């Protein structure tokens, strides 16, 4: 398969991000896997990318530090060549309610889930070669279609990123497409035990989890769907309608 350029996948060593990194490799991209710290999972993810016949590199960055986020696209380019696919998968998911929301929780979610993807998108657009087209995919959440009062700061950050996705689709057209993927109950979260996760799955229309591989299928579709921009695919077994 021809080299389609390089992909930068934030949070690319674990959970959904890892699947998306491998799918990018399957689609013909060399992959820069962003992590906060290098560990065995990061090395294993890089190995999976290389198993697809693509190059892989691991980059470290605390996305709450704007200067580090700004530099990340350039670091990926230095290792792998021009970055033509940006996948913003890294995310913070902490519980708070409006009654106990504080500045620390607000800043944690907004800096990681909203500000960092925007900073990365800006750097991506600035560095994209004039003769190339690009794609940005933001990992959102079905909650943006059905917001609730729990996980208050998290939901606000993802809802704002969904608005930004549509705004960026307009601002960066025609050379860069911008889309989102909205997971539902995909993997048991740190706030759930197996019974909690099963109960959440049972609330969906299809009564089954939206497996990480389904997120990968959505990414592969968006890579190839050259007439699609400003959209979110809710891969949530219909949870946003339940």
Residue ranges and their predicted role:
Residues 13-15:
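Conserved glycine-rich cofactor-binding loop
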Residues 29-43:
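Conserved glycine-rich Rossmann-like NAD(P)H-binding loop of the short-chain dehydrogenase/reductase
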Residues 81, 173-177, 229-230:
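Short, small/polar-rich loop/turn modules that mediate ligand/substrate recognition or access, typified
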Residues 89-94, 238:
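Conserved NAD(P)H cofactor-binding loop of Rossmann-fold oxidoreductase domains
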Residues 95, 135-173, 185:
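Catalytic loop of short-chain dehydrogenase/reductase
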Residues 211-235, 240:
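C-terminal substrate-recognition "lid" of short-chain dehydrogenase/reductases
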């Amino acid at each position: 398969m021809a080299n389609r350029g390089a992909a930068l996948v934030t949070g690319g060593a674990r959970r959904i991000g890892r699947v998306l990194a491998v799918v990018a490799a399957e689609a013909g991209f060399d992959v820069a896997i962003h992590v906060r710290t290098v560990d065995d999972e990061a090395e294993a993810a890089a190995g999976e990318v290389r198993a697809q016949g693509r190059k892989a590199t691991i980059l470290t960055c605390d996305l709450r530090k704007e200067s580090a986020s700004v530099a990340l696209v350039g670091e990926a380019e230095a290792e792998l060549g021009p970055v033509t696919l940006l996948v913003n998968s890294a995310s913070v998911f902490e519980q708070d309610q409006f009654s106990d929301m504080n500045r620390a929780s607000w800043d944690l979610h907004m800096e990681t889930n909203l500000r960092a993807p925007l900073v990365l998108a800006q750097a991506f657009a600035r560095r994209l070669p004039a003769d190339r087209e690009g794609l940005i995919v933001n990992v959102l959440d079905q909650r943006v279609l059905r917001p609730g009062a729990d996980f208050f700061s998290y939901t606000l950050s993802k809802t704002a990123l969904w608005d930004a996705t549509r705004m960026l689709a307009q601002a960066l057209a025609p050379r860069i497409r911008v889309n989102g993927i909205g997971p539902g109950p995909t993997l048991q979260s740190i706030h759930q035990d197996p019974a909690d996760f099963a109960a959440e799955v049972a609330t969906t229309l299809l009564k089954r989890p939206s497996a990480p591989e389904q997120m990968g299928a959505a990414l592969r579709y968006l890579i190839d769907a050259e007439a699609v921009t400003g959209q979110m695919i809710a891969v949530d077994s219909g949870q946003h309608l339940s």
